Amino acid sequence: GYRPINETQGLDFYPTPFNELAQIYDRTGSYTEYPADSKPYNDFWKEQYKRCTEGYTVGKYRITGDHYFFLNFYRMEVISEGARGGAGRNEKFPTFLAKQYEFFHYVEMAERLHKDVAILKARGIGLSEIVACLAVRPYITNRGYRSLLTCAAEGKLTPLKTKCWKQLNWLDMNTNGGMRHLRQKVNNADTKRASQVTPDGVEYGWMSEIDSVIADTSDKIRGDRVDRLIYEEAGSNKYLTKSWIKGNALVELGGYHFGTRIALGTGGDDMALEGLSNIFAKPEGYNVLPYKNYDTEDRKPQLTAFFIPAHKFSLREEFLDTRGVTQSEEFKKFYEEERKKLSGKDLLDYCAEHCFIPNEALYKQGENIFDSIAIADRLTQIRIFKAGLKPEYVSL
């Protein structure tokens, strides 16, 4: 089950056992020394597939299967601490981060309860890597599993596809065959299917698939049923609500909700946030698993979709403890200092993208026929600094 790991809970948690296999690969350049197709080799990979699908428990803490795969088999570009600007990034395994641990459990619980997933988040927290993992992991470990990646714009879908295809290629080349799947029938820029073809042209094999489509209209969310339907950059999709409703037909059969819709949106998007805002604020109306969010204007909990504020997710070691928990008060001070450097529309944009509460993330939704800069300047005083006109005593 899920045990909270945050600034006040899970103080005895130790993350090292959960990414031990990644550490072995880093030291040796290999996951296992057993010869391919030997019994120890087969037993090793059978256990890894089990952990990637059922999760992994050490002591009283458990990570989900997706999270185990992410920590031990997913490669991503990271910035080295202390590196000079322009030095580039290095490819590494992810580190354990408590907020990601919470989100992976949220996804698993939604799937167990036949609910869907929606998240509103601050910009720059690397969630696209997790989205790619949510497509790649079941492709590798589950026969016949189908994931569909959708986005309203090609420019925003291509980076996600690139991440997925890069992972598949890395696993093909670096797991000594343990996670390698041939793609002899469908292997193009938009779709990958794990299968082989007989000399007579008959397709057979693992048959898992990752497909993608540019859903710039709601009518393009159609086709064969899928197990995970991912709406990337949902906050930029002006057809999100219609696409979400039509997408239900792809994850449901005869009233049974067997698949999962996953919508991911970022604060600060212009004009098209209404759909994501509605889904976020009224999760149960859209079959989304409700999340008790304490990061609100009055600090009273609200049932929303999942929310990750900027100050509770750091990738900088100076704001992280040994458990991967962000020291939120210190990190919030960092963002507050950055906010003090800006004003007007620039401040509004910054607060929307690096939000502390959902209201900030959604400031820019809707159309505005008035002076946006003047309004932004006043709104940022009221909304961000809580400033207002102070009453004065005067003589009549």
Q: Which ranges hold each PLM region?
A:
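Conserved P-loop NTPase catalytic core
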Residues: 31, 198-201, 207-211, 225-229, ...
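Catalytic P-loop NTPase motifs of RecA-like helicase/translocase cores
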Residues: 125-126, 157, 237-240, 271
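Pre-P-loop entry segment of helicase/translocase ATPase cores
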Residues: 1-116
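Substrate-engagement module of ASCE P-loop NTPases
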Residues: 247-259, 264
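Post-Walker A helix-loop "phosphate-sensing" segment adjacent to the P-loop in P-loop NTPases
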Residues: 138-145
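Conserved nucleotide-state-sensing and coupling region of NTP-binding domains
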Residues: 146-216, 285-293, 393
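Conserved RecA-like ASCE ATPase "motif II neighborhood" in helicase/translocase motors
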Residues: 188-252
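Walker A/P-loop
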Residues: 112-135
